[in-house]
A protein has these predicted regions:
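Conserved active-site segments centered on acidic
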Residues: 1-68, 138-146
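Phosphate-binding/catalytic loops
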Residues: 71, 81-146
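Short beta-strand scaffold positions
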Residues: 74-75
Length: 146
């Protein structure tokens, strides 16, 4: 929702797995944390895994993102509804996918929001996102134009 917990982790994880010519970004559907760094607990687990997300800043998803990105992964069903509501046509809607559907096709499983929990919740979210990003990486590298 606010682009400080799950989505910066996903951005950092996916960016670490892809060549530098891929553009990876994250955004929240809410405006609460625009310009803020990721939650300290997200930064901590990412750092433990060798990924630095401390320089990321929260931003809000915008209609322009449909033009700027080929794939838009969301963390939960509410984010999905919020992003789909901004889409102007079916081509834009087709870009939006729940990230855990990469692991559990058509299950529409949410990545739990760890914000109100303890560090363990962030660790679990990291592991889920890492697995999903491995699948995404393989798909992107397989489909990349030569």
């Amino acid at each position: 929702l606010g682009n400080i917990c799950r989505s910066p982790l996903a951005e950092g994880i996916l960016r670490s797995k892809l060549p530098s010519n891929f553009v990876v970004d994250s955004a929240g559907t809410g405006h609460w944390h625009i310009g803020n760094p990721p939650d300290a607990r997200s930064i901590k687990i990412a750092k433990e895994k060798g990924i630095d997300i401390s320089n990321l800043k929260g931003r809000q998803f915008s209609k322009q993102d449909f033009s700027d990105f080929d794939y838009i992964y969301v963390m939960d069903n509410q984010n999905y509804k919020d992003v789909i509501a901004l889409a102007s046509h079916e081509n834009e809607k087709a870009k939006v996918k729940l990230i855990l559907n990469e692991l559990f096709p058509n299950e529409n499983v949410d990545v739990p929001d760890p914000y109100y929990g303890l560090q363990d919740g962030f660790n679990n979210v990291y592991n889920m996102l890492d697995e999903a990003c491995n699948v995404i990486k393989e798909k992107l590298l397989k489909n990349k134009p030569r």
